[in-house]
Amino acid sequence: MAVTKPEVHRLISKVNFSDSNRKPEQIKYLVKHYVGATGGAEANCKYFYDKFRGASSHFFVGHDGEIWQCVEENDTAWHCGTSGKYKHKECRNSNSIGVELCVKKDANGNWYYTEETKKAAVQLFAYLMDKYHIDADHVLRHYDVTGKNCGEPDVRKGNKEWSQFKQDIVEYGKEAAPEQTTTPEPTAPP
């Protein structure tokens, strides 16, 4: 039994990606980002839609839990590249899917995710993990790939919030797609 795909709205960018036609087995990582601005998921997709921006992401998860797709999964979004300085030995744009979480600012100027955003992100990550057979140790923050302060709420709050997110996606995946057990065939009495 597979994890059910959450509802995803689509506005696929015409310019901000590499047309790579990746095979499913080439996708080895999921990378979590934060938008770093207060716009919603649909607004971000529109921003990347038809004007060259030099960056992109496959998905945006909005404040109310809505999910928008901006780049096809088999194409390469430009979400975790650098000018050549990587912390992670293997994760790159070419073998990962990028997911941007929309954020809000609190009274102290700190970015945070709404509960709806976190819940929808857990569902999307669990679905993508199941679809591409990706283990939790291959779910990374942009910070883990390049050292960039992204997703800022996960980095600022240390590993506690990040560890909780990873635990949540694993638990959701187990609940949404329980392991199949086989029932032995009854045997005929002797």
Where are these regions (language model features)?
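N-terminal catalytic cores of peptidoglycan-degrading enzymes
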Residues: 1-92
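Basic/polar, cationic surfaces and motifs that engage anionic cell-wall
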Residues: 2-12, 19-24, 94, 102-190
